[in-house]
Structures are given as C-alpha cells and as structure tokens.
UniProtKB/Swiss-Prot annotation:
Acetyl-CoA binds at residues 215-217, 223-228, 254-256, 261. The gene is GNAT6. It comes from Arabidopsis thaliana (Mouse-ear cress). Residues 151-288 form the N-acetyltransferase domain. Keywords: Chloroplast, Cytoplasm, Plastid, Transferase, Transit peptide. This is GCN5-related N-acetyltransferase 6, chloroplastic. The active site is at 261 (proton donor). The record marks 261 as: May have an important role in the acetylation of the polyamine. Autoacetylated.
Length: 288
C-alpha cells in the first residue's frame, strides 16, 4: 500500500493595522487530504508516505504591544518640558518621549525600508514585523550602553488651535543620534584597525563623536525641509553634548541622500590610505 499525504502549513507573521497588531501562528501542520494507493506483489506489501508542504495565507490573531495607545492624543509641547527643541515652519524637531512616538518612528522606518518593494508578496506583513523589531530596538538603544548615548529624534506637527491629532498622525520624520567613543586605534567610524585580542574603548572626552542614522520622512510630508532641519537639530544637539565631530554613512548609489547631506553641511571623508569596513557606502562628516 502506498500512502500520499498532503499537508498545509501556517506561517507566523506579526502585522499592524492602525490601532491593532495581528499575530499569526505558524509551524502547525494540518492534514489537508490523503490519497491511498494499494499495491501488492506476491505475499508482500509496501507502504510509502509522501508529505508535501503548501504555504497558505496566514490566519489572524488580534493583539497589540503592551501599553501602546494608538488613539492617544498628542500632548501640548509645554507638557514635555523640552528646552532642546527646534521649531521650523509648521513643525518641531525634538527628542521622542512617548512610546507611541517611538512606534511611529519605527513604522516610518519600515515604510522607508520597503518603499521600493511594494509589489512583493506579503510586503505589508514584512513591514509590520520590521516595525515591531525596530520599536524594540529603539527603546533598547535609547537606554544606552557602555557609556554611549542614543536619542530618537522626531519631527512633529505644531499644535493648531481647535485641532486635535493623535500621536501617530503628528510624527512626520525621524532619525537616531548616537554619541559614541572611537575604538582604540580608530580615527573615523568604521575604520579597519589592526586586530587585537581585546578591543578597548577610549572613553576620553576628545574621543567622542556623533553618529546619525535611520533618517526618514513620511512620504506625505516630504519637500518641506523636514530632513534638513532634523539634521541641523541633531548636529546642534551633539555639540551641546560636547561633541564636535558628527558623521553619517550614505550608500554610494543614493545620490538623493548624498545631495541632502551635502546641502546640510556634510562632506565626504577622504579616507585615502585608510581601509573602511564597508565599500558600498561613503562616510560623511559635518564641516560647517
């Protein structure tokens, strides 16, 4: 007797749809149907089984990250007690304070990451999973480690009389600013240094530098100077922390980003004889 079993599998995706997070279970194999073929030869019988895995769209289980309120209204700016903030046009750049702001920053990064791949299958699920992972990573980075400091900077819409907005509709841009220490032997971030048994960090004040990453702006809010002004605020924040050198990496094929950074005062670092860890990017330093 030959037996053929065909099973279906479910996959795990974590998705976000406005005010809901959806979790989908996977790796549970359910028999779909079975075909049995009898085959006899003399007094012997043989039995074989073949399992075929078929991917199907995931089922939905509703839940949300603990403590997040996606309908939470944006509090008035004075309630944050922020002295370090930068107003420009209809927006304000400052450090994120609320979990809902961290989440929206993570979602903007997910949108940016998958922007050129919108036709891929299950792209919305991938974006939502990316956003959840980035949300947790932002909170972890902002707690600091080894004396290093990281801030999630956001651009939010200014308050308007008689208009109430939720937090997730107020945040229109984001970036990360890290205050780091050069590794022993480094003269710029990402430089290849001679391999050592133990890698040490020189925590002298003069060996600190600022590093900007994860800059993105909501598609609906672009071409309003948000990216440039967030960069200016980040540079000024680094200087207020006693850091003069501020760096950013940009992909060599991303001419739009290169133009943005150079317009804001960044210039490509001529590493020359030095080796960089990443040959696909340029290192830029703020010089103005």
């Amino acid at each position: 007797m030959s037996t053929i079993s065909i099973h279906r599998t479910e996959t795990l995706r974590i998705t976000h749809a406005r005010s809901r997070i959806f979790r989908q279970r996977y790796r549970r194999t359910i028999p779909l149907w079975k075909l049995t073929i009898n085959s006899r030869s003399s007094d012997t019988s043989k039995k074989e089984e073949l399992s075929v895995q078929i991917s199907i769209p995931p089922q939905v289980d509703q839940s949300r990250p603990e403590g997040l309120r996606f309908d939470r209204l944006q509090p008035p700016e004075p309630e944050f007690g922020h002295e370090d903030r930068f107003e420009f046009g209809k927006f304000v750049a400052r450090e994120a304070m609320l979990d809902e702001e961290y989440w929206t920053a993570a979602w903007l990064r997910a949108e940016s990451h998958w922007e050129d791949r919108s036709n891929e299958r299950y792209v919305d699920n991938y974006k939502r999973k990316f956003a959840e992972q980035e949300f947790n990573a932002i909170k972890r980075r902002c707690k600091g480690m080894q004396g290093q400091k990281c801030s999630c900077i956001v651009a939010v819409k200014k308050e308007e009389k008689h208009i109430k907005r939720s937090v997730i509709k107020s945040v229109v841009g984001t970036l990360d600013l890290s205050i780091r220490y050069f590794l022993q032997g480094e003269t710029f971030p990402g430089e290849k240094v001679k391999s050592q048994l133990f890698c040490s960090i020189n925590q002298e004040g003069s060996n600190r530098y600022g590093y900007i990453a994860n800059l993105c702006v909501a598609k609906s809010a672009r071409r309003q100077g948000i990216a440039c002004n967030m960069l200016r605020f980040a540079v000024e924040s680094a200087r207020l922390s006693g850091v003069e050198q501020v760096y950013v990496h940009v992909h060599k094929n991303n001419s739009v980003a290169q133009e943005l950074y150079q317009k804001t005062g960044f210039k490509i670092v001529e590493t020359g004889k030095f080796e960089s860890l990443d040959d696909d990017t340029y290192l830029l330093q703020y010089t103005s």
